[in-house]
């Protein structure tokens, strides 16, 4: 089993049904294989706020998950990460890229 497969299996066991993602991230393909619905966004900040909304609307019962590229993609997402952290909103952020 590859690490990315293990991550997706753990996400599924934790009840994550949707993975918001900005390409390129290998987790997107493996999440789809694990029956986690990938939704592709056009900008990192938007995806992070969507993950934040999933957690807020479910009162934390469903954790919003967001995957993005490493480097500049992560920097674009910092505003949303800081807001979620400051307001104690549970989100899962998975920065990755080409291996």
Task: Briefly describe each language-model feature range.
Residues 1-99:
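N-terminal alpha/beta PP-like core and its mobile active-site loop of ThDP/TPP-dependent enzymes
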């Amino acid at each position: 089993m590859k690490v990315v497969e293990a991550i997706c299996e753990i996400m599924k066991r934790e009840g994550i049904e949707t993975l918001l993602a900005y390409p390129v991230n290998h987790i997107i393909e493996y999440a789809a294989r694990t029956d986690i619905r990938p939704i592709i966004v056009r900008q990192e900040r938007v995806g992070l706020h969507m993950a934040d909304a999933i957690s807020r609307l479910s009162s934390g019962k469903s954790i919003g998950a967001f995957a993005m590229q490493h480097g500049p993609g992560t920097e674009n997402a910092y505003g949303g990460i800081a807001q979620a952290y400051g307001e104690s909103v549970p989100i899962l952020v998975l920065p990755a890229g080409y291996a």
